[in-house]
Curated annotation (Swiss-Prot):
Catalysis: reaction(s): L-methionyl-tRNA(fMet) + (6R)-10-formyltetrahydrofolate = N-formyl-L-methionyl-tRNA(fMet) + (6S)-5,6,7,8-tetrahydrofolate + H(+)
Pfam entry (one): Formyl_trans_C
Entry superkingdom: Bacteria
One GO MF term attached to the UniProt entry: methionyl-tRNA formyltransferase activity
E.C. numbers: 2.1.2.9
Species, as recorded: Streptococcus pyogenes serotype M6 (strain ATCC BAA-946 / MGAS10394)
Annotated protein name in UniProt: Methionyl-tRNA formyltransferase
Length: 311
């Protein structure tokens, strides 16, 4: 049985971890995940999906704010793990930790060397890519730059958003890891170096990127909305108040960027730099997420054709 240390945080990571837990060839000695966070207005404490899964299986849990230089680092290097598996962990692994194991493998949600970094799924959708994928790669000190063990791809559908693609890639990543790891460990599968000249990056989404630019084409704004749903969520402004936009549909029509060009009891169409978008699901400031029909029956009632949002 191969003894592993697992490192990751979101549901993507938990899906990969569950695959390892269900496989009798592997024993998970411990998991390293982000600290619990206070979320929402009530500041409720929320544990990570990886921690929740570890709790259910009685696995030791380590939650350093920063792994390098921590007491937890000393503890996990002494666990006697054969190897490390990471998936959406979000921190560099200290040399001390890498040197303590025979192998360290990362499950990364892009087709490397494209989209190294923390938000590959967001950028794949926002950039209008036709496919996304997962790469199994060796861990080195440089971010997502290790040799490639295996890759798998899947089409990005017009109906996909970050949430749906996240779920698809988690399953692909889980299966790809379990399929390739035995051959990698036996030496049958030889890792291939990345072409570093082709590397692109996907840094974490900044607050500035969340704001919609109505001068873009309707396809670009549509992709941007999908690439921010369900987090961190794209927004525009209505009378100085933030209006989050979760879903929209491509529409025909012309007008000034951000201008209301159609308003009925059931629809609100906004012009973009080229074409238009029909808003489907929105969230006004201080309100819950709602359908465009509910919005037009409430705060949106005062909007008129010709008004411009986003200012």
């Amino acid at each position: 049985m191969i003894k592993l240390l697992f490192m990751g945080t979101p549901q993507f990571s938990a899906t990969v971890l569950k695959g390892l837990l269900d496989n009798p060839a592997y024993e998970i000695l411990g998991v390293v995940t982000q600290p619990d966070r206070a979320v929402g207005r009530k500041k409720d404490i929320k544990v990570t999906p990886v921690k929740q899964l570890a709790l259910e299986h009685g696995i030791s849990i380590y939650q350093p704010e920063k792994l390098s230089g921590s007491q937890e680092l000393i503890e996990i290097t002494g666990l006697g793990a054969d190897g490390i598996i990471t998936a959406a962990f979000g921190q560099f692994l200290p040399t001390l930790l890498l040197d303590s194991v025979s192998f360290a493998i990362n499950v990364h949600a892009s087709l490397l060397p494209k989209y190294r970094g923390g938000a590959p799924i967001h950028y794949a959708i926002m950039n209008g890519d036709k496919e996304a994928g997962v790469t199994i790669m060796e861990m080195i000190k440089e971010m997502d730059a290790g040799d490639v063990v295996a890759k798998a791809s899947t089409p990005i559908l017009e109906t996909d958003n970050v949430g749906t693609l996240f779920e698809k890639l988690a399953i692909i990543g889980r299966d790809l890891l379990l399929d390739s790891l035995p051959a990698y460990l036996s030496g049958e599968l030889k890792p291939i170096p990345q072409d570093h000249s082709q590397a692109t990056f996907s840094p974490n989404i900044s607050p500035e990127q969340e704001k919609l630019d109505w001068t873009m084409s309707n396809q670009e704004v549509f992709n941007h909305i999908r690439g921010m749903n369900p987090w961190p969520v794209a927004h525009t402004f209505l009378e100085g108040q933030r209006l989050k936009i979760y879903e929209a549909q491509l529409a025909e029509g012309e007008g000034l960027p951000g201008q209301v060009i159609v308003k009925t009891k059931k629809s609100l169409v906004i012009a973009t730099g080229q074409g238009a978008l029909s808003l489907i699901v929105v969230q006004p400031a201080g309100k819950p997420k709602m359908s465009i029909i509910d919005f037009l029956n409430g705060i949106g009632r005062k909007l008129e054709v010709g008004d411009i949002i986003g200012r």
